Amino acid sequence: MSHNQNQPHRPVPVHVTNAEPNPNPNNLPNFLLSVRLKYVKLGYHYLISNALYILLLPLLAATIANLSSFTINDLSLLYNTLRFHFLSATLATALLISLSTAYFTTRPRRVFLLDFSCYKPDPSLICTRETFMDRSQRVGIFTEDNLAFQQKILERSGLGQKTYFPEALLRVPPNPCMEEARKEAETVMFGAIDAVLEKTGVKPKDIGILVVNCSLFNPTPSLSAMIVNKYKLRGNILSYNLGGMGCSAGLISIDLAKQMLQVQPNSYALVVSTENITLNWYLGNDRSMLLSNCIFRMGGAAVLLSNRSSDRSRSKYQLIHTVRTHKGADDNAFGCVYQREDNNAEETGKIGVSLSKNLMAIAGEALKTNITTLGPLVLPMSEQLLFFATLVARKVFKVKKIKPYIPDFKLAFEHFCIHAGGRAVLDEIEKNLDLSEWHMEPSRMTLNRFGNTSSSSLWYELAYSEAKGRIKRGDRTWQIAFGSGFKCNSAVWKALRTIDPMDEKTNPWIDEIDDFPVQVPRITPITSS
């Protein structure tokens, strides 16, 4: 993988080779052989993107030339004209002021990301692939065939040797109970919140909005109530607890916080994303439910948002867009990730999350719908024109030989944070969006180092890019997440400043970032103990 931190978007010189005699009687080089198509496309992109400036230059030149010919008499005549129309000028000025005031008071409030923090568990909670298989075998519930099935999944998952499991499941025998689940939730959430409050200097009493998402663990009192109690948040806080919304719920929480910040002036919003493993380790033999055991790991993140204009100078990012897609009206999409009791004849009643075989196809449809909505908001005009021209050629003129045009999102974003749901998901998105290994590196390394941490994985990926020193002022980052329902959600962030890795003391990658990226084999054999 490339360590180059600058994207390869600059044109390169055209080289023409004359090794063979040129059959062209005019001695002109065959540019079809010498010009790479992607650079022609890049030049077209630059031309269309700057078309407005090119068109305005002659108008500006003509205006300057006209103004330069103004004399004192011309200015005197203009003054006299305005003086005799004083009332009209006054009304026009008042109207302009009124319209400006209306615009500034009704426009959406800008939402800034002050900082975020990802929880890094204690080294004692590291779960190697061998440890996972050992604990699975010691439980005494899984059949030999299903133990072999889990080992096969794990060997191909892309997970490394330093992912984390909760203490209750590492014990022999394991102790999955409500008390241990609460302990895991508190450890992860409070650890992430402590770090983000310390980094930003924001006091708990200043937080006016709290949004917590955890899909499978929803105790009473809620997780959000646990945070209010721990940090003694104020009594009129707007508190929300989102459950059952899958791995995409982190961006749903961001969108909800954004909506609340539009109507709550001068407020801070704390968003906490996590998942609980302790009570959701499936102890049965339904294979559709065993995949979750193999890839989900312990983790969480806390994000602090603000709509205060004074916070812009110290914020890292500005939230530009959020786009949410819900395919739940389709029965197949609704049931492709489904929590239920297993149907094993020998051991019924074990609850797990079943993943259907058509999950990838459904995720692809959800992604297509999402980017169709997002594209016009972020893509440069050059890409939109190419897409429209291709669509007209295929649909209107019935030119079937032309393939559907996939917009180049690398022209809209410098960084991609794709939910580390599994190797197959990342492979498909890399292929469909034509992304490079460099673009996919944060997602693949997060999957390798931390596993699938559900909704918080996007923040481990952004933290990776920060630790690598990749985030520069003005850079745009696209976060994409998938979740049960079935949902696909996107968030677009713009960096307000260059992130210096040396300032990121609590970044979960910072003490080992030089060890990455690592080569992840397609199959990593697990050595038996």
Swiss-Prot record:
SUPFAM superfamilies named in the record: Thiolase-like
- Keywords assigned by UniProt, alphabetized: Acyltransferase, Membrane, Transferase, Transmembrane, Transmembrane helix
| Record's keyword annotation contains Transmembrane | yes
Location relative to the cell: Membrane
Residues covered by region (Disordered): 1-22
Which InterPro entries does the UniProt entry name for this protein? 3-ktacl-CoA_syn (IPR012392), ACP_syn_III_C (IPR013747), FAE1_typ3_polyketide_synth (IPR013601), Thiolase-like (IPR016039)
Q: In which tissues is it expressed?
A: Expressed in aerial organs. Expressed in leaves, flowers, siliques and stems. Expressed in roots, young seedlings, leaves, flowers and siliques.
Q: Which GO terms describe its molecular function?
A: fatty acid elongase activity
* GO CC terms of this entry: membrane
- Under Enzyme Commission nomenclature, its number is 2.3.1.199
Q: Which GO terms describe its biological process?
A: fatty acid biosynthetic process; response to cold; response to light stimulus
The record places the active site at 247, 326, 415, 419, 452
Q: Which residues cross the membrane?
A: 52-72, 84-104
Q: Which residues form the FAE domain?
A: 103-396
Q: What happens when the gene is disrupted?
A: No visible phenotype, but reduced root growth. Kcs2 and kcs20 double mutants have a glossy green appearance due to a significant reduction of the amount of epicuticular wax crystals on the stems and siliques, a significant reduction of C22 and C24 VLCFA derivatives in aliphatic suberin and a roots growth retardation and abnormal lamellation of the suberin layer in the endodermis.
Kindly indicate whether the keyword Membrane belongs to this entry.
Answer: yes
Membrane topology category = Multi-pass membrane protein
Q: Which family does it belong to?
A: Belongs to the thiolase-like superfamily. Chalcone/stilbene synthases family.
Described by its record, this protein's role is as follows:
Mediates the synthesis of VLCFAs from 22 to 26 carbons in length (e.g. C22, C24, C26). Functionally redundant with KCS2 in the two-carbon elongation of C22 fatty acids that is required for cuticular wax and root suberin biosynthesis.
Q: Quote the protein name from its UniProt record.
A: 3-ketoacyl-CoA synthase 20
- Native source organism of the sequence: Arabidopsis thaliana
